[in-house]
């Protein structure tokens, strides 16, 4: 699934503390949210997919929400560096 953290990334997160944990967590969540955007893009590129009104509304909300949260987390990450 796009955006999933690898076992190595999860282990690093598990072992991290303090600012290093914050950095790894935010980086991982940005990656994870990016995976949702990949899935949204793939859905809309699939012929006939996402045409139902409820699905279209849901996926559009996911797209805008994930993009907004990525921007927030990117700003948080910049503040931590």
Residue ranges and their predicted role:
Residues 1-81:
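All-alpha RGS (Regulator of G-protein Signaling) helical domain and cognate RGS-like helical scaffolds
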């Amino acid at each position: 699934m796009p955006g999933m953290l690898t076992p190595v990334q999860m282990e690093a997160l598990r072992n991290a503390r303090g600012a290093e944990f914050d950095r790894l967590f935010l980086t991982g969540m940005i990656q994870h949210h990016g995976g949702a955007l990949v899935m949204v893009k793939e859905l809309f590129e699939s012929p006939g997919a996402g045409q139902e009104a409820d699905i279209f509304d849901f996926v559009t909300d996911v797209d805008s929400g994930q993009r907004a949260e990525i921007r927030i987390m990117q700003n948080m990450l910049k503040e931590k560096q």
